[in-house]
Amino acid sequence: MIQDIYPMKLDNAFQMKEPDADSRILAFRDRTVYLKNEGEITFLKYHVWVEYCKTHHKKVPGLVYLFSVDDISFYLTELYEDVEIPGFMYHKLFAVRSMKPKERVFAATTAWHLYVWYRDNQFCGRCAHPLVHSRTERMLQCPVCNNMVFPKIAPAVIIGLTNNDQIMMTKYAGREYKRYALIAGFTEIGETAEETVHREVMEEVGLKVKNIRYYKSQPWGFDSNLLMGFFCDLAEEGEIRLEEEELDRKSTRLNSSHMSESRMP
């Protein structure tokens, strides 16, 4: 799972701290992240960024502390439009998923989660005044009406629907991700995670389920989610009826679950 980076550990505690020379700098543009990928991810170091700015007679932009991975601190900033640092470029987040090492993939996706929150919450949704960063916790606050805005975390489920030795595999229709995937979806207002499992399976493939069992969860910063994994069994045989705006009819089916991981579609 994406958070499995042991023996390293992500420390997400809020801090007001200054960067050191080896702190890592993360910047995003659309759904891309600025890094070097030569066999493994290399993030921009703070001292390299400072030297670049000095050499090009530019002011070092402001930084926001994000988190640490072991003893390395990560910061968010905005790069200049014309920045050119040898080996570095903007990479699509979709491509980062398959890069190495795992702890840097996890760092990039978690940083993206926070970046989207900061980007989308510059003004108060109640009175429209600019929000300011709290100095005591990870929170944005309106100085006029005192509205407080915390990071967005959207609960969602991912479902292993089984029938004897088979498991339901789907393919999304018209999306960048082309590989097989389990049924998944967001939890709605007034709904438990277990009720989400029932609803999502019915909506996406038209089947009833039983014996819902919680498995594990994982943070999914790509879409600001907390993904909760469940297994469940097919309650009764029935025709698969696809939500065709979401799923590819030709590719969604029950597949053998006793296949080795390397043979799974």
Please provide the spans of the model-predicted regions:
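N-terminal alpha-helical interaction blocks
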Residues: 1-101
